[in-house]
Regions:
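Gly/Gly-Pro- and Ser/Thr-rich, intrinsically disordered tail segments characteristic of DNA damage-repair
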Residues: 1-99, 151
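DNA-contacting surface of Y-family translesion DNA polymerases
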Residues: 65, 70-171
Length: 171
């Protein structure tokens, strides 16, 4: 609690702290109850603390995946953890299904790094309240986003070999 309290007293804001054996479980623990709390989520606590939670609470599981899982009768993280891995992969794809099935079981082998790795790419995204339906609407936004990315790349003295533009809908 010492670090959490020091941040609150010296900087004036609250933080949640999650403690566990891997990054996934520590992050899940930090989201249990807010604000200004310390929680644990050790492997032996997974069945009582994590598995009763709805699948939407699993780290990195988005709305589209949640919908597919709930339509298949998988409503909790525990349901997902107890499903066959191939069933989750069929619903979510091989790579995402494997990763999320492991997460539901509390497995995360990603290393803790003292220094962040250098970014492999530069990106920017914008969410709109209303659908974009014409080129005239999207062009100024696209130009602004290109300028933002180009500025970051110049600052880091980077060049690129490809550019990708993605448009997504909530559907």
């Amino acid at each position: 609690h010492e670090i959490k309290d020091k941040i609150r007293n010296e900087l004036g804001f609250t933080v949640n702290v999650g403690i566990s054996t891997n990054k996934l479980l520590a992050k899940m623990a930090s989201d249990f109850e807010k604000p200004d709390k310390v929680h644990t989520l050790f492997p032996e606590e997974i069945p009582t603390k994590m598995w009763p939670l709805p699948v939407r609470d699993l780290l990195f599981l988005g709305k589209a995946s949640e919908k597919k899982l709930t339509e298949a009768g998988i409503h909790t993280i525990g349901d997902m953890a107890h499903a066959r891995e191939v069933e989750i992969q069929t619903l979510l794809g091989n790579k995402a299904g494997h990763q999320l099935w492991q997460y539901a079981r509390g497995i995360d082998d990603s290393p803790v790094r003292a220094q962040p790795e250098e970014a492999k790419g530069f990106s920017v995204e914008t969410t709109f309240n209303d659908d974009i339906v014409s080129v005239e609407q999207v062009l100024p936004i696209l130009l602004e986003q290109c300028d933002v990315v180009a500025t970051r790349m110049r600052r880091k003295e980077k060049k690129c070999t490809s550019v990708s533009v993605t448009f997504r809908t909530l559907d």
